[in-house]
């Protein structure tokens, strides 16, 4: 999975099938490929903590709970699996936790989270 962001409008696009693309554009400019963990945010508040219990997957953002305030919060948590992906949107005031259920024969691959100030983070 690859995430791209528009520098102007801040829109995020998710590429899920891995097909090569010459250039994704938004607002008349090329979109930037986001790389997990490339900002200066504290890893303990951003790297997803993942618990897999049978078909249930719980993703908590950070080993130290991430703030969920209007000015600083987790916008979404995405789960990559062997059969695709699932995504949950979060709002300020909510707990930085997302729960997912895997389908039969589906396995966890990675969890991603996006912080509005510190960008994309990943746990495999």
Question: Can you say where each PLM-predicted feature lies in the sequence?
Answer:
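Exposed aromatic-hydrophobic patches
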Residues: 60-61, 97-104
């Amino acid at each position: 999975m690859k995430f791209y962001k528009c520098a102007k409008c801040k829109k995020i696009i998710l590429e899920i099938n891995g097909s090569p693309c010459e250039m994704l554009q938004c607002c008349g400019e090329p979109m930037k490929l986001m790389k997990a963990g490339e900002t200066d945010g504290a890893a303990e508040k951003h790297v997803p903590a993942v618990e897999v219990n049978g078909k249930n997957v719980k993703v908590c953002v950070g080993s130290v709970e991430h703030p969920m305030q209007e000015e600083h919060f987790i916008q979404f948590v995405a789960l990559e699996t062997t059969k695709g992906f699932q995504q949950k949107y979060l709002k300020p005031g909510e707990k930085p936790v997302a729960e997912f259920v895997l389908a039969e024969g589906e396995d966890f691959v990675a969890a991603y989270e996006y912080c509005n100030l510190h960008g994309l983070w990943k746990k495999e």
